[in-house]
Every structure is written in C-alpha cells, then in structure tokens.
Amino acid sequence: MRGIMAPKDIMTNTHAKSILNSMNSLRKSNTLCDVTLRVEQKDFPAHRIVLAACSDYFCAMFTSELSEKGKPYVDIQGLTASTMEILLDFVYTETVHVTVENVQELLPAACLLQLKGVKQACCEFLESQLDPSNCLGIRDFAETHNCVDLMQAAEVFSQKHFPEVVQHEEFILLSQGEVEKLIKCDEIQVDSEEPVFEAVISWVKHAKKEREGSLPDLLQYVRMPLLTPRYITDVIDTEPFIRCSLQCRDLVDEAKKFHLRPELRTQMQGPRTRAHIRANEVLLVVGGFGSQQSPIDVVEKYDPKTQEWSFLPSITRKRRYVASVSLHDRIYVIGGYDGRSRLSSVECLDYTADEDGVWYSVAPMNVRRGLAGATTLGDMIYVSGGFDGSRRHTSMERYDPNIDQWSMLGDMQTAREGAGLVVASGVIYCLGGYDGLNILNSVEKYDPHTGHWANVTPMATKRSGAGVALLNDHIYVVGGFDGTAHLSSVEAYNIRTDSWTTVTSMTTPRCYVGATVLRGRLYAIAGYDGNSSLSSIECYDPIIDSYGLVTSMGTQRCDAGVCALREK
C-alpha cells in the first residue's frame, strides 16, 4: 500500500450490545452461571461478574469477606420473585419495564440492590405520572427512598397545582406539620389566599374533634390581610370554627385592620402580608375586529412582569366574534366570523414549543358559531350559544383534545349570542347575551354531572358582549351593551349566596370586551366604546376596589379572543 497510514482506533456501536445479548442467552440456558439467587423459593441462575459489574450491592457481596462470597446459592430478602426477574432482565439487557402496577415494588428493590439505572427509570416514570391526586404521596415515597430529584419535582408540582391538590384525599390525610409546611410555602401558586384558607378549614372539618385545636396554629400561615374585605366579612366572619376561637379572631382582626387602616400597612409588613410567588402568567389577545373595519389575524401577548406587549404568529384565518381558551399550555381559537361566514373551525398553538410555533387546525365544532362563549373544565373545552348567520343557538358542545373530537351536550334554556361562559366550583355559568329580540340579564348554570341547565339569579343589568371572569369566588361581568348604551359598569356574582353586587365601574365604556384574570387581578381588554375600537387595558384590584390602566396593545380591536396562560 502506498503512503503512510496513521494508526486509528475504531469502535463499533454493536459490540457492547452483542456481549449483553450473549451473556443473557448464557443465563437463560444456565451456561457458565456460577451463582444462584434465591427469592421466595424461586431460583435465578446468574453470573457473579455480571452482577458485580452492574450493582455495587453484588460487587461488595462477591468481593468482600461476606459469608455469601463463595456460596453457590444466595438468599435475597425484601423483594418478590417477579421483581427479581425484572431486575435481572435489566442487568442483562439494559431494559426495564416500569408500570403503575410494579413501580412501588421496583423502586425499593432497585435501591436495595443499588441498581442505579432502574432507580432512575422508576423516578422518571413516577415524575411523568405526577397528578394533583398523587403528587403528595409520590413526594413522600421519593423522600423515603432518597430520590432527591423526584422529591423536588413532586414538591414543585404540588406548589404549582395547589388549588387542585387540596381537593384530593392525600391532602386531607396529611399531618398538621405537613399541612403547615405546604401552606406557609411562598412558592404555592394561587390567585388569592381563598383556596389556602378553604384548604385549612376543609382539613380541620375532616376530623373535627382531633383537629379543631390545630386551627389557630394553621391559620397563622394563611395570609388573610391579602384577602378582600368582602371575603373576610362574608365567609371568614361567618365560619363557626373562627367565631369560637379567640386566637383565630385576633388573626381576623389583624386582616381587617390592614384594610381599615391603610396608613399602618408599612408597620404591619410580615409573612402574612407577603404575597405568594405566582407563576409568570401572560395574557393573549387573538383576532377580533380591527380599526380598518374588518376581521384581523393579529395575536399579541402581554407580560405583566415587564409590562410589555409583543407579537406572536398570526392565526391562519382572520376572525372576529371569536372565542379563545388555554388548556395544558395550548391556546385554542374557536369559531368566529371571517367577513363572509360564521365558522366552526378551530386553531391551536402549542405554547410549549421551543420557538413561537405555528397555528394548526384541530377538529371543527359540530355547529358554526360566532359570538359563542367558551371555557374549560378539567381536560375539556366547552362552547355554548353563538350565531351561525341565521339563528342563535341553545346548544353546547365539548371538545376532548385527547381524541380530537367534539360531542354535543344538553341545550341551554335560552338561545344566546354574545353571552359569557365561565366555570366556578365545577359548574358552568352562561351570562347575558342576545336572543335575537332582546338583550338578556338572565343567567343559567350547567351541572356536568347531571347534564342539566338551571336558572340562577339574573344580573342587575342586561348585557350582551360583556367580558366575564372568575376572581376570588366571584364571577365578574364587565361592560357590554344594554340595547341603548355601551357600558362601563361592573357587577359581581357570589356563587355561595346566589346574589349580585355592583362594584366600581371601569373608566371607559367597553362592549365586545375581553376579560381574564392574571396574577390575582381582573383585566378588561380592548372592546368598543360606542365610537371606536380600543387598544387600552384596565386592571381591577379587588383588594382596593379600583382600576388602573396598563400598557396599551399595539392593535385597536374588539370582538377578540382573550385568555391567560403560564409563560413557557
């Protein structure tokens, strides 16, 4: 051969795998095996060198002066034969089959035998299964077996999903110390202190005799000064547990003083006046009717931390009278009117994408709808009412993103377009709207368990094109059109008492206005004031019962879709 060729190390990608396959075949045929592991009277032939190479437990057993060093049989205690079989398969194949059924046996066994790969696989599997109903149990399980990363992941999950977590049995069964640790954490993500207070009361009521004495100790970690005066007087003052405890009353009086004597607030600063660290939520505004008197496709995002607006990719079809919701880090844009016809089509943007992503189509609704109401409950999207170009609808349908399918549900009692749809305490409320003849003040609610609609107390004012949102256990209805005037008035519905109260009006009349809650405040977005479309945004703080203006959007619009979601 001509020339000088430099030596080169060549590595094949199949060598290690080939050796493992060969050793596994030898194990299964009991060839060259020099030890037998005995578990629950079942024998597992194996090779010491393979076990020692994979497990520090076996390495110590076979290389130290332990009694098992030279024995042909080794009894393994503390695990089942079926688990031993899974672990040996991993040792010889690098593959482990983790399931919901076996993980609670597999992880402790992997810890016992010091099989790091199996332990890691089990932890990753459990992290993928985290849910509000199981995260507290997984956290304890991880702590027991010193799985630090899994323990931290479960802890963060429980903080992020606190309002859902406290609805499940695992929370109710916590010890007092565990409840204290959770509720005093700055990182639990709640829009207000209401779910924290209600979680404490729920925990105490579960075992009243044993837990009633713990209430003052727990209540000191509830940041009651950050609750609204209305909630303090309507809910906390009427709670029998509070009224019977002098220590609890002192904490309530502190909260009242915080509101009644604002000049003393600087002297009252402490753990109970420090807000929880909320997730960085952002506001999305999609489509609508622009200043050029036509539907638009513009999407803007508002970040309350920076108080800045930015543009996201445009939707694929220009739409006004559009509804928008967020679900599992995805934004859905539903129905609307493109200037020619009402739409049944739905677009989706995956907000977890590395880049800004692209909009893509999902299954269309069964009915074409403009000015429909939309909301989410659980893992589903609900859409009701709307106008198809010829008639207003009473129908409601539900979208399941897991199967990309819409299904029809029970009809409302009244056909409505321009109505608001919102969920409170697991019930869907539809508010106001226009039936083709009259602007409505009627309100009906849908129970997903029974599939039936029922009327509740009507609003004080007839409204179509109002914005609706849930904040601190009250449904707020902002602006709209009453048939004569474009409204700046706002009213709030107390779902506990089935009653309405008027709250401070916005500074600007707004019809076809969007409304959503962000970081414990109510945002009224854009709309039409009777003369022109708006780009301005008002922000309502329920604690001080007043509005403030935030940075305006770059685009004037009404009839837009509005939603909030956690920043990626």
Curated annotation (Swiss-Prot):
Post-translational changes noted in the entry: Ubiquitinated by the SCF(FBXL17) complex, leading to its degradation by the proteasome: ubiquitination by the SCF(FBXL17) complex takes place when aberrant BTB domain dimers are formed.
Pathway linked to the protein: Protein modification; protein ubiquitination
Domain BACK residue range list: 135-236
Stretches forming Kelch repeats: 282-329, 331-379, 380-426, 427-473, 474-520, 522-567
Bilayer-spanning residue ranges: none
Main location group: cytoplasm
Family annotation (SUPFAM superfamilies): Galactose oxidase, central domain, POZ domain
InterPro entries: BACK, BTB-kelch_protein, BTB/POZ_dom, Gal_Oxase/kelch_b-propeller, Kelch-typ_b-propeller, Kelch_1, SKP1/BTB/POZ_sf
UniProt KW Electron transport keyword: no
GO molecular function, one term: ubiquitin-like ligase-substrate adaptor activity
Pfam annotation, one family: BTB
Domain BTB: 33-100
SMART domains for the chain: BACK (SM00875), BTB (SM00225), Kelch (SM00612)
Keywords: Cytoplasmic vesicle, ER-Golgi transport, Kelch repeat, Repeat, Transport, Ubl conjugation, Ubl conjugation pathway, Wnt signaling pathway
Subcellular location: Cytoplasmic vesicle, COPII-coated vesicle
Record carries keyword Repeat: yes
One GO BP annotation of this record: COPII vesicle coating
GO cellular component: COPII vesicle coat; COPII-coated ER to Golgi transport vesicle; Cul3-RING ubiquitin ligase complex; cytoplasm
Disulfide bonds listed in the record: none
Subunit structure: Component of the BCR(KLHL12) E3 ubiquitin ligase complex, at least composed of CUL3 and KLHL12 and RBX1. This complex interacts with DVL3 upon activation of the Wnt signaling pathway by WNT3A. Interacts with DRD4, KLHL2 and SEC31A. Interacts with PEF1 and PDCD6/ALG-2; interaction takes place in response to cytosolic calcium increase and leads to bridge together the BCR(KLHL12) complex and SEC31 (SEC31A or SEC31B).
Domain notes: The BTB domain is required for interaction with CUL3.
Protein name from the UniProt record: Kelch-like protein 12
Gene that this polypeptide is encoded by: KLHL12
